[in-house]
A protein has these predicted regions:
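Carbohydrate-active enzymes and regulators
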Residues: 1-116
Length: 116
């Protein structure tokens, strides 16, 4: 049964019956990769990692690898991205847009805390 899932999704996507999404390749929290201070916006008063870090190029690479893998599996790039844990920030949204995704998914509570 499991061997039939990817081919079925691939065929449905190629026929235009579904839009598929992916997540960043190794499932990182993109806002934290972009800037560890993003945690403070969502959780004021929470301790921040020491030393602080910002690796936006790693976020771009995670998205690029996800696009490559998805395209290899499903025959076309994904339409959208579902960020790990639904996490978003302005920097993560910019990285997602730069990567060429048309949409991203999250939820209202996360969006309200993210300032995105």
């Amino acid at each position: 049964m499991l061997r039939k899932i990817v081919p079925a999704y691939r065929a449905a996507a190629l026929r235009g019956q579904v839009e598929l999404s992916c997540s960043p390749y190794f499932h990182p929290i993109l806002p934290l990769l972009c800037d560890s201070a993003a945690h403070h916006h969502a959780h004021p008063g929470a301790p921040l990692p020491e030393p602080p870090f910002a690796w936006p190029a790693d976020a771009d690479a995670q998205l690029a690898r996800a696009l490559q893998a998805h395209t290899a599996w499903f025959g076309q790039p994904p339409c959208g991205v579902w960020p790990s844990e639904g996490s978003v920030s302005e920097a993560a949204a910019s990285a997602i847009a730069r990567a060429g995704f048309r949409w991203m998914a999250s939820d209202q509570d996360i969006l309200a805390r993210s300032r995105a």
